[in-house]
Amino acid sequence: MARAPPPLSSLPPPPRRPTVVLLLGLALAFCLAVLSIQSSFFTAPRLASRLDLDSDEVRALSGFQSRVQQCVARRGLGLTADIIDHCKLVLRFPKGTNSTWYNTQFKYFEPLEYNYDVCETILLWEQYRNMTTVLTREYLDVRPDGWLDYAAKRIAQLGADKCYNRTLCEELLSVLLPAKPPFHPRQFATCAVVGNSGDLLKTEFGQEIDAHDAVFRDNEAPVNKKYAKYVGLKRDFRLVVRGAARNMAPILKGSSDEVLIIKSLTHKEINAVIKELPNPVYLFQGIVLRRGAKGTGMKSIELALSMCDIIDMYGFTVDPNYTEWTRYFSPPRKGHNPLQGRAYYQLLECLGVIRIHSPMRAKRVEDWSDIPSREEIRTAHAAAFRLKRHETGQSDQMGPFSNCKVWGTVDPDYGPVSGTPDMSETRKSSNYKKWEVLPFDSLRMEAQEHHVQMGGVSLYKMDGNKLDDLVCVRHERSSS
């Protein structure tokens, strides 16, 4: 039998509605809606304008990515490029590639795919065409704490973490520290960067290498009649690590004009050797590539790009089925991650930074038409630059000085040439300082024009891979 409902008098009273709180909430929501509409009204045109601008850059970069993808497919010896977006892509080696390189630090075999940001890469390397890559006195003078902090990082066995005794640090650096840049952007039209790979013995590149305006070599790689038909005889620049710098006398034997660039540090023992040599010797001033190829070869490309229009690269080939790291003049040895380097070099070729010459391409007639043209690269660089500026909220100022963080000015008579009073008579009587005292009007016309376009300003990297931090030094013109 159904139970009758309780009388109304026995039901609990309905809860009181928080009318005041509810009304306040509605009022607040209404105000926020009005504020949002007003904000949208005033910001929508600016946002739309920015989106339109960004979309233009995205379209330009997407088209460039397609060109890079096609270039990798044609020139990559099996490598393929998968586009992620307008800036990012992945380079992949084919399945079955022999990945035998074991990273003992992180406990894994070398991977077969590598992620790259093309926008970041093209900004970095195109900027290098305007850079100075030799450490100078003007850089240390202009950079904040240049002598106290940075100079100490370039001297081994200093006994302190900073140059508290500047006089001592100047004594240790003076033998290889020019006052101003001894080399200039656009100084050479064509340059060859010659590595040490055993693949060089498979093709006779010697005459082709020697035909370049300047040749860059690494560490202790020999240049003699035995290997002349493979690697040539021309010797202009040599980039060495500190260990090889200790043996620079036998390395440089036979060429008093070959310029030696020490990649990392100097110290008393190296300085003692320099004082006996007739060769120009300097310290490298560059960047740290954490996601690119490793080793002295990559630094040689950086060095060459700061002086040369076209860079041809020999002796860095890695066959996809490599089994060991080989050198043309000695037994196989431990080296750097070959596949990572091979992938990055291929990316650089398809960005117009280098041209790779390989025994695996020897039977081909070299045709560079599948590499993006300089005009395409300039367009992509401008798009990447503007996009980066908008993303970081910076101004649209274009030009080579937009990333200058520190400015300085030096007069025409600034600073001494490199050297010390206790150098040997061999060095004092040599022509080691010829690049430092080279008359401006003897430079290649393109180098002179670039200098004028830059307003006599030299650009230096400040720290690591940061694209936005440059030390910029303006050289005042002589009144005569």
UniProtKB/Swiss-Prot annotation:
Signal peptide: none annotated. This is Sialyltransferase-like protein 5. It is a single-pass type II membrane protein. The gene is STLP5. May possess sialyltransferase-like activity in vitro. Residues 39-480 are lumenal. CDD domains: GT29 (cd19952). GO terms for cellular component: Golgi membrane; Golgi trans cisterna. Pfam families: Glyco_transf_29 (PF00777).
